[in-house]
Amino acid sequence: MGRTLGAVICVFVGLIVCLSFHVYTVLHRAMPPGLAEAEKIRWFDELGRLARRGSGLMHDVGINIGIQPMKIFINTAFSILFNPLPWQRVVYRNIRVNQDVYDGVTVSTYTPVKNSSPPNCQGYPTIVYFHGGGWTWLSVGVYDGPLKNLANKTKFKVVAVEYRTAPQDPFPAAYDDCLAVTKYIVQHSKELNVCKDLIVVAGDGAGGNLAAAVAIELSSFVRLQILINPALQMLNFATPSYQDFSDMEMLPGITSPEKEITNWMRYGNINLSFKHLLQGNRHVSLESYAAFSDFLNSSKRLPSPLKVSNKSTIHNSESNDTVSPFIDNLILDSRFNPMFTQDVSFVADTYIITSQFDVLRDEALMFGHRLLENGVKVELHHYYHGFHGFFLFAGGGWIELKESQKAMEQLVNYLNKEILRLKTN
């Protein structure tokens, strides 16, 4: 009995020592210079690092990390991060929340009690929102707090789409669901009390990809697309921002080349054994690359006044015939890679949010440049203290960041002035 108790005490003490050392390591880990509120962000990064290690271990023992129990675990963890804690009372009395089904797809609606539409517009101005999570993780429920805050701040009705996710439902399932819901809203605007002339599509990360793709398909009906840290292309993984985050492991739990490449592979239903080909930019034919390489010419398309990087895109120079025929077809599909739509002159007005600490930074900036070049009205806001996913901390949860609140304030001002045509201070 005494030996057993002693062993238990030794194990307990050992765990305390290990935990204390781990906390010490996290607290003293170097953070990227220039990142505001780093003491909060280091813990977001650590959560992602732990998930990454766990995913690696599961992969090593042959467990598919996209299985439903793992999704539930990840979604629960991020739900705690994004939403109020149980003992907090964050009440939006001016927002009505409902669940519904539009054309077979589950949605959650967040409707302000007071309608902010201009007098000549019947129904609510409406944001159709597509959540992020690499087309694999997260859900509308995880985003509940931020979505309530978005509706409360903007005074727009928000319709959040619970689209199908990979690997169970790869491309084009998520796109089809988002398109179906947006079409349904357009076709049933009167009965849904939606102002048909003020329909906005929006999303962050993978959701930004879906918003851009839907905006292209329904350009005649979309008034504005809001792209927040969007994933827009898998042609080249050596843009300056990808290089920046390959050269130094900055915030790998939040954003990293390996993480984004894996997301694209799951969405595209590409065998993960080919990951090394994508990491080496050998996954597409040189013919296809030549057709679109100008869209990724950082010397031409990155706004020089922003000074986001001193690097240039390293263009593809090799190809592997094992995967390139299949991936070429994906690249050519604007539903999958909206960045490579040949004619973008018809695209709706665009509001783009980019972050300095994000591997996806440069593709959004270069896409914005090409839209401007083709006569599209573009409003670009780059946040030097922002990171991938930072916009979700603008309010609605127990953690709020100043840079996120600034981004929300600027978006609200734009919507009021340019979309609703309201007088602003």
Provide a role label for each language-model segment.
Residues L57-M70, S79:
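Chromatin/DNA-recognition segments of nuclear transcriptional regulators
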Residues L5-I41, D45-A51, L57-G62, R89, ...:
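Alpha/beta-hydrolase superfamily serine-hydrolase fold, recognizing
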Residues F73-N98:
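N-terminal Rossmann-like dinucleotide/flavin-binding domain of flavoprotein oxidoreductases
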